[in-house]
Each structure stands twice: as C-alpha cells, then as structure tokens.
Design a protein with these regions (language model features):
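Beta/alpha (TIM)-barrel catalytic core signal, keyed to glycine-rich beta->alpha loops juxtaposed to Asp/Glu
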Residues: 33, 57, 129-219
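Surface-exposed, active-site-proximal loop segments in enzymatic domains
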Residues: 86-100
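N-terminal binding-site loop/beta-alpha segment at the start of enzyme catalytic domains
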Residues: 1-76
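Generic structural signal for well-ordered alpha-helices
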Residues: 3, 38, 61, 65, ...
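A structural motif
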Residues: 46, 119-122, 153, 177
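Active-site groove signature of glycoside hydrolases
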Residues: 114-133
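Short, acidic/polar
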Residues: 29-41, 99-118, 162-171
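Conserved, mostly hydrophobic/aromatic
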Residues: 6, 18, 34, 41, ...
Length: 219
C-alpha cells in the first residue's frame, strides 16, 4: 500500500480508501462478510474509511466502529457525513441552509453518528450535500468549527453534487474546510479544471468518489 498526506491535516492515509455505502443493508449485504472485507482491507494496509449516516441510517457507521475496535493497535482514519435535514440528494439551488444544515441539525447528527459508531470522535466530518451559497450564512460552518473545537471530530469536509465540481470552489478558497469529496474517474475529469488547482493552492485534501465508476471500470 502507498500512503499520501491528507492535505493540511498532515495525516498519512492509504491512497486507496474504503467506501462503505454498499454495507448499508443493500440487497444481499451481510454483516459478517462486510466485517471480513473490512478486516482484509486493514490487513492489506488500508487506513482510510468513509461512511455516512445516510448509509442505512447509521448501519454502516456501526460496522466502522466495530472494525476500529477490532484493531486497537492501528491508526485507522474515520470519515462520515451528516445527512441534510430535508433528506434530499443532491442539493438544489433553492435549498437554504435551514433546509439542509441548520446548526441544531448538525449537532444532532454529529452526536447520532458518534453513538452509532460507538466512538468518542471521528477524524473527518463531512456535509453530505453542498451548495457554495451556504457560505453566505455562516451559522452552519461556525457550528462545525465549534464542534471540532469540542473534539467531536478533527477535520471538516464537504461532499459535492454529481457533475458540479465548481460548486465547492468557494468553500475550498474560504480556508474553512479540510477536504472535498468529488466524483473523479476517466469518464468525469472536470475537477481537474478548477477544483483541483484550488485544492492544491489551499492544501485541501481530495477524496475521489467512484474512481472506478461504481464498478464499470473493474471489468
């Protein structure tokens, strides 16, 4: 396994991470098989695991907590995402911060995710949908900074809408976030135009979502 520095956090994470969406009560999913798969990835050197409350209403977060506790001697990095209050993906232009991430909702779901996983803190907490215009109402990001300072998580990230890499550039350039998750593979390379240069400039980590196009590129 090769490792990379995760932006300005300076974490040394495996360049191949584990996305846990498929472990959220999908048809045919099995908890024992999921845990075996997670453990094999740890044994092979994977150290970065990405989940979300929206993956089975916390089901996937619970599995992540189990694999963390099963490997107490290893530093495994935990990333999860808060759902929008209206539970609608992706975000739309007309959605306001209060529709999706009012401060009380953020605090509630950060604590729900911690309880689901049985962890005291996450390494990375992400907005599961994002609109750059939400920066105009800083209550959401300020609540995240407050919870980060309380030690509930250690870095802040955003997960961008499909085909909208430009819709996170303001957040990246604000200096308020530590990572951005965006679709990037041989079919969709738009993030290279503006988003990736902004991330390099601000030392913001990039998480490539569906790098194999949800299995299309694996044969």
């Amino acid at each position: 396994m090769k490792y990379r520095t995760f932006g300005r956090t300076n974490w040394k994470v495996s360049e191949i991470g584990y996305g846990m969406w498929g472990m959220a009560e999908w048809s045919g999913s099995d908890d024992d098989e999921s845990l075996q798969s997670l453990q094999l990835s740890v044994d092979l050197g994977c150290t970065f695991f990405d989940t979300a409350w929206g993956y089975g209403a916390g089901k996937s977060e619970g599995l992540l907590g189990q694999i963390i506790r099963a490997n107490p001697g290893k530093k495994l990095y935990t990333a999860t995402k808060m759902p929008p209050k209206n539970f609608k993906w992706p975000a739309r232009r007309e959605y306001t911060l209060d529709d999706c991430f009012p401060p009380d909702h953020i605090e509630e779901y950060v604590n729900r995710s911690l309880k689901n996983a049985g962890l005291d803190s996450f390494d990375l907490m992400q907005f599961h949908t994002w609109e750059d215009k939400w920066l105009e109402d800083d209550r959401g990001i300020r609540k995240m900074i407050e919870l980060k300072e309380q030690g509930l998580f250690h870095a802040i990230g955003i997960s961008l809408n499909r085909w909208e890499p430009w819709n996170g550039i303001k957040a990246v350039k604000s200096g308020l976030i530590d990572s951005v998750q965006v679709i990037y593979n041989i079919f969709d390379q738009n993030p290279k135009d503006e988003l990736f240069p902004a991330c390099r400039e601000m030392n913001v980590a990039v998480i490539a979502r569906v790098p194999f196009d949800e299995g299309t590129l694996t044969g």
